[in-house]
């Protein structure tokens, strides 16, 4: 996988990786652990790519953020990565953690960007501005890029307005969108879902995120109303070009699905085309790819154009519901996904 990324460095704005630290979590479960030496060895194969460590759990237990020894252990790992030339910044969601790191080693933090994670839900200029203002109270450098909230994938007017104002206020900061996390529109489960992941990272024996999603959460909603699969604010490979120049990069998710599948996801977005079950391209919706099929190549050619400025006002529109009747196939039984 790392050699594949190296061959495609020209297409990469940045890469993200977990520290696999027991006191500082990322926002994913089920990611295989790698020793720091192996991580550095792999990252050195990407010399021209900006590298960010994921410290983006929704929250951390107070005993981690208030304990100087535990914070120092995290900082030691960051220092090792910086010295190896393999780290330019961190991705965070928990501001308590950000301040704890900055207070303990401001000199190190002054060499690192602090990038608000996509789960900070940056959907407006005031929200962006206040996050950056809070960041200014730490030693960290301002981010060179941020990823905006998923809702803006389907609200082009708001996106263009934010992009225009951001260029005036922060001319050196690039904007991006998360392309392939196919969750519910303005997902009501989002904060609880993130918190469930955080709790599972603190105590892996209590990890129940997938069971919660399938029995009580978003996966259950998709089964109840399959039109939500199309109403989800994803960006297809064929449609991302239309978002320039408001954004300068896209983020692709799915680390827990493994390197083989991530290679395919990245390749389809590089080539701006995909033929197959749309759900297999998506992170989250892939849970349902063994039951539902949406042939991406059969969707209307203007699907992206029709949905990029709908503002997710599904209460006043039937476009995706009508499409779902023709394009969402419910097999009714579990089948093995093509990418399994």
Where are these regions (language model features)?
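Active-site pocket-lining/capping segments in soluble small-molecule metabolic enzymes
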Residues: 1-131, 142-251, 255-340
């Amino acid at each position: 996988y790392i050699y594949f990324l190296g061959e495609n460095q020209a297409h990469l704005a940045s890469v993200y990786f977990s520290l696999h630290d027991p006191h500082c979590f990322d926002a994913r479960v089920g990611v295989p652990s790698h020793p720091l030496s192996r991580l550095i060895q792999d990252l050195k194969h990407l010399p021209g790519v900006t590298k960010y460590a994921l410290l983006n759990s929704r929250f951390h237990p107070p005993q981690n953020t208030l304990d100087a020894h535990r914070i120092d252990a995290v900082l030691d790992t960051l220092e090792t990565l910086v010295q190896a030339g393999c780290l330019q910044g961190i991705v965070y969601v928990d501001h308590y953690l950000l301040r704890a790191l900055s207070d303990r080693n401001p000199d190190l933090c002054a060499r690192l960007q602090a990038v608000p994670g996509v789960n900070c839900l940056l959907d407006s200029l005031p929200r962006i501005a206040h996050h950056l203002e809070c960041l200014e109270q730490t030693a960290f450098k301002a981010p060179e890029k941020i990823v905006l909230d998923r809702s803006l994938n389907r609200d082009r007017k708001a996106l263009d307005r934010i992009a225009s104002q951001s260029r005036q206020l922060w001319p050196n900061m690039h904007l991006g969108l998360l392309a392939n996390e196919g969750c519910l529109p303005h997902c009501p489960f989002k904060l609880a879902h993130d918190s469930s992941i955080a709790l599972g990272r603190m105590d892996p024996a209590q990890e129940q995120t997938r069971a919660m999603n399938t029995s009580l959460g978003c996966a259950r909603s998709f089964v109840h109303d399959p039109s939500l699969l199309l109403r989800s604010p994803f960006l297809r490979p064929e449609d991302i070009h239309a978002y320039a120049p408001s954004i300068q990069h896209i983020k692709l998710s799915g680390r827990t699905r493994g390197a083989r599948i991530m290679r395919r996801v990245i390749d389809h977005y590089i080539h701006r085309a995909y033929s197959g079950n749309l759900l297999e391209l998506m992170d989250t919706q892939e849970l349902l790819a063994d039951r539902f099929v949406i042939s991406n190549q059969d969707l209307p050619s203007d699907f992206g154009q029709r949905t990029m400025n709908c503002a997710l006002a599904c209460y006043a529109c039937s476009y995706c519901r009508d499409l779902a009747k023709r394009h969402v196939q419910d097999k009714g039984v579990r089948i093995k996904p093509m990418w399994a």
